[in-house]
Amino acid sequence: QKDWTLRRRTDNEVAKTLPATQLRDQMATAAWQSADPGVQFETTINDWHTCPNSGRIRASNPCSEYMFLDDTACNLASLNLLQFLDKNGKFDISSFQHAVRLWTITLEISVLMAQFPSREIAQRSYQFRTLGLGYANLGGVLMAKGMPYDSEEARALAGSLTAIMTGTAYRTSAEMAEEMGAFPGYADNASEMLRVMRNHQRAAHGIVEGYEKLSVLPTPLDIDNCPDPDLTETAQSVWDETVELGKKYGFRNAQTTVIAPTGTIGLVMDCDTTGVEPDFALVKFKKLAGGGYFKIINRMVPKALTSLGYSDQHVKEIVNYAVGLGTLAGAPKINHDALQNKGFDLDAISRLEASLPDAFDIRFVFNRWTLGEEFCIEVLGIPEAKLNEPDFDMLTWLGF
């Protein structure tokens, strides 16, 4: 374990010394708790930099998908992966590649048409012509196929799709370079960019060694665990073609793909999950424009359960259990009969029922504001001091 010194920017003197491992763990925990970008590994970032002769990559945008030279920018576009699954769960590779090709061309056109916030950003963006094509709803695809998000098969599938997207985008960029010429900054960086392309090619073939000028070896494509051999074969062939075309014509764009969080556009695109992320909650509360909320379940849950072999009846029961019935009538455990046995009259039960649609948790319904303080103290026998405790749980008090 080594110490890490923090130095003052004013005079470069040591301000504090911290254990490096402890500091790393604190940063990792903070990134995990906040779900915001954490540490950026500068060495690896610059080892895969396509234009190192034009300067180092020093930072990223706030969401951390775009890493390139200072004073550059890229337009973003994302594809909804779920739209490429057919009814049998087979991924439509040719349609996906067509969409990637079409959007790569569209984004290239947008470089010329875009407006930038400063002269420097405009000039450098025209010079390097970076693009930002990505995808969303990976979690939805995995759910639809009944695959655990944290599994070797899921990682292999995600790696294959990403390799196909990036390889196809760079291949399209090389084809555009044949017609339009390479980006202006390519000549100064040709050998380095081709080196990066060859490293991508090796990774797509699942090769574990032989990489060029990398400080840390990458995790190559897991060919054996990919559930669809057509995906890995396509990833390999498209990267072979990309490298060959790049040798002949160069590339129209210094970068072509990023994977953004898609927190906003993912909703517009009707995605069940955003970016590469799993679903943060299978059941969510949707706020209504006229007031109030209603519960919705991820639409992929029934499809995932069917893929896992559950019968239609079992799927229906599981969905009802997850979403809830919206009423205590006939519910297991906490129902009208059980409440009447505890002293609840019909008026109190009606007040509970009226509060259920807006409740995020059933515990939030059982409180003195819904039932009335007098009812809680005189009928249910709850001491006033107990009722005023911040962590008081009425359901536990009632024996549920």
Residues covered by each model-derived region:
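Long, C-terminal-biased catalytic regions of enzyme "large/alpha" subunits
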Residues: 1-400
